[in-house]
Amino acid sequence: MKKYLHILPACFLFYAAAHAQQKDTVYVTDFGAVPYSYENCVTQIQAAIDECKRTGAKVLSLPEGRYDIWPEGATRKEYYISNTSTEQECPSKVKTVGLMLHEIDDLTIEGNGATLMYHGKMTTIALEHCNGVRINNLHIDFERPAGSEIQYRKVTGGETEVTLHRDTRYEIVNGKIRLYGEGWRSNKNHCIEYDPDTESFTYSQGWNTLSASDAREIAPGIVRFNTPAEFMPKAGNTLTVRDIIRDQVGFFILESKNITLSRLQMHYMHGLGIVSQYTENITMDRVKCAPRPDSGRLLAASADMMHFSGCKGKVIIDSCYFAGAQDDPVNVHGTNLRALEKIDAQTLKLRFMHGQSYGFNAYFKGDTVAFIRAATMERFASATVRDVRRISDRIVEVRFDRDIPTSLELNHDCVENMTCTPEVEIRNSYFTRTSTRGTLVTTPRKVVIENNTYYKTGMSAILIEADAEGWYESGPVKDVLIKGNTFIDCAYNGGPGHAVIAIHPSNKIIDAERPVHQNIRIEDNTFRTFDYPVLYAKSTAGLLFRNNTIVRTETFPAASGNPYVFYLNGCKKAVIEGTVFKGETPRQSIKTENMKRKDLKTTIK
């Protein structure tokens, strides 16, 4: 008996030691990562991550400082990522991942304000099949961002002088300017011009003109071009130029669960931004997507900043800040695949249709799907997935638990994954300096967009689509609340109807008795706008626009030529009431098409 009594304390101590080890904090500096060394730390930080996985440590800590990460030694892995590149644009889907978290649970990465400074073209961090990962207080930037910035310095007929940002690398070869970076050259460029006087981001042909003109360097960072006499850009404006090929993404979260990014600052993202793909429960808390204040840069993302594709559970975006995107700051959607062939009574061959979205897992066993009529965007039947078989990067075979609807039209109708659709909350956030929309959201589950500011988004501040013939992204929405937001001078670049809020499904058959969207409420918002309409709504039932204030500004010239404040097309049971106009009172307030008078109730005369 005494022998066993001696063994018990030893067992307890072993258990306690093992349990304590699981709770230990792992420090990247213990693995050789040295802040401010300006040396490649990628293998050292990855070793610390791997140690957390091996031991079950709960915290990975980066002491404050700068840590440099190069492609050499980084993980290379093939990922098919939604909305990125076609087979022709980027034949290889292998990504260079700076830091890889694979099958890691319940880990907090504490950044302590540290900066990860990346080099070359890289996907900064990837989370694959993780659960309960939280990343706190970390800055991510690139030594040479893939976006270049060129400011017009002097402009005269026939000559244009520019200043290139200190982070923009260039060379002049045979009298023509070229942009390059660390291990890359910019070939197929897209250009957006920023006007500091109007704070607008507009599409520009300026780079096309400069790159075709003879150039000579007159001082480091200053280049003079012999440009056509009619080329007269505005001195002080800045061109933001980036390659259109989305060969990497800013940050990738794949098929994971319960992920939180908190006080993360993404100062530049190449390709596409933070992409969350088929992930459940994501919280973006005080995430800032914008250049470092001391960088002098305008651009923070080559395209979208937060992109959610096929996610489920809840997507929460709270107290975030977005400035400097060449596409949409927030985009939430699914992916519809087209029905190509009926293999048997319960099996369909489906195809990814859009060029830039294919190859990923779009359906999982047990998922509920809806069959979508492409012409009307109607969900006309449902089923449960029994099996999925990948045929190629573009083609999958899906077997269902019941017979395929006889009314399904092959090579036209689509299949939507209803399980992989999230609830969405976007609150207390700020959107600015983008040439496109502020928020795109399409999900059948509850959406709340509340207490945000949309400041001079180039197109509609909020766009709700639904399509099975363009991007093939999701079907109808059922429950959307847009409340307490402030919209300031949005849609100067256009969009559906040039509207501040646009509800624009892709259905070709417009019938108020067969609406696409339903139950969209727009309440207690303030619209400061230079143009109309404030709202464009197509094929929506149960549309409510109530107790909103509209203030007319003169920030930009009116561009739409539309005198109507509201433009409703094929809507049913629409209510517009309690609208307060300040400044100019419009002479014509509401335009309707493809709907009956009884389908609109309004207090506006």
Curated annotation (Swiss-Prot):
Q: Which Pfam families match?
A: Beta-barrel_GLAA-B_I, Beta-barrel_GLAA-B_II, Beta_helix
PbH1 repeat spans: 256-278, 312-334, 421-443, 444-466, 477-507, 517-547
- Reaction(s) catalysed by this chain's protein: Hydrolysis of terminal, non-reducing branched (1->3)-alpha-D-galactosidic residues, producing free D-galactose; Hydrolysis of terminal, non-reducing alpha-D-galactose residues in alpha-D-galactosides, including galactose oligosaccharides, galactomannans and galactolipids
Q: Which SMART domains match?
A: PbH1 (SM00710)
SUPFAM superfamilies with a match to the protein in the record = Pectin lyase-like
Q: What is its EC number?
A: 3.2.1.n1, 3.2.1.22
Signal peptide location = 1-20
Going by the UniProt record, its keywords in alphabetical order are:
Glycosidase, Hydrolase, Repeat, Signal
Q: Which GO terms describe its molecular function?
A: alpha-galactosidase activity
Q: Which Gene3D superfamilies match?
A: Single-stranded right-handed beta-helix, Pectin lyase-like
Which superkingdom does the taxonomy of this entry point to? Bacteria
Sorted alphabetically, which InterPro entries does this protein's record hold?
Answer: Beta-barrel_GLAA-B_II, Beta_helix, PbH1, Pectin_lyas_fold, Pectin_lyase_fold/virulence
| Role noted for this protein | Alpha-galactosidase that specifically removes branched alpha-1,3-linked galactose residues present in blood group B antigens. Has no activity toward linear alpha-1,3-linked galactose residues.
Which family does the UniProt entry place this protein in?
Belongs to the glycosyl hydrolase 110 family. A subfamily.
This chain's protein is named Alpha-1,3-galactosidase A
Whose protein is this, by species? Bacteroides fragilis (strain YCH46)
Q: Output the lineage of the source organism.
A: Bacteria, Pseudomonadati, Bacteroidota, Bacteroidia, Bacteroidales
